[in-house]
Amino acid sequence: MSDLVKTALSLVPMVVEQTNRGERAYDIFSRLLKERIIFINGPVEDSMAMLVCAQLLFLEAENPKKEISLYINSPGGVVTSGMAIYDTMQFIRPPISTLCMGQAASMGSLLLTAGAKGHRFSLPNARIMVHQPSGGFQGQASDIERHAQDIIRMKRHLNEIYVQHTGQDYEIIENTLDRDHFMTAEEAKMFGLIDDVIQYRAETKKEEKD
């Protein structure tokens, strides 16, 4: 484990709860998981995807009907890792609410728009970026050709996913994703990537009565 990772882990705050059996300490992310909140933070890669998928499956096993909240602040990353999270989101039974805080770029934007219809949000100062997949290859010419064919096939498949979740025509998605395309939260809403931009958390009925 790198020194940077060790330092980051040591900075995760702990929270203490009073229970019938006395005090119990949780790291902040474990405590939020009890509230069915999962974070996608940083680059999307295999280790992070494994943890996110495991949390999704655990929360489904705990309650297959109760909503799960996915908070996203990610520059994107590995397509296959992102697709593992995406497929798990579609596979499990609980509805999933997504919220962008900071940024949702590349695969992060796909996971943002993959939330349940009507439950895809962004904070007002977040930014969303969409683009086509990229990759670099080396080796024999025939191998490079096969990799190129695969990435073109992957590009089409990702375009179809954006079409499904945004309601845009395929040609619009293809043209928009041709280069890095940055959007404000409001622009992402107009494009169909999200359903609403929220600045303040709505009060619950219990809070209103109090």
Curated annotation (Swiss-Prot):
| Gene Ontology, cellular component aspect | cytoplasm; endopeptidase Clp complex
Give the GO biological process terms.
protein quality control for misfolded or incompletely synthesized proteins
Compartments it resides in? Cytoplasm
The molecular function terms in GO held by this entry are: ATP-dependent peptidase activity; ATPase binding; serine-type endopeptidase activity
One Pfam family from the record: CLP_protease
- Write out the function statement from the record: Cleaves peptides in various proteins in a process that requires ATP hydrolysis. Has a chymotrypsin-like activity. Plays a major role in the degradation of misfolded proteins.
> NCBIfam families annotated for this entry?
clpP, PRK00277.1, PRK12553.1
The protein's name: ATP-dependent Clp protease proteolytic subunit
Q: Can you name the source organism?
A: Bartonella bacilliformis (strain ATCC 35685 / KC583 / Herrer 020/F12,63)
Q: What is the lineage of its organism?
A: Bacteria, Pseudomonadati, Pseudomonadota, Alphaproteobacteria, Hyphomicrobiales
Q: Which gene encodes it?
A: clpP
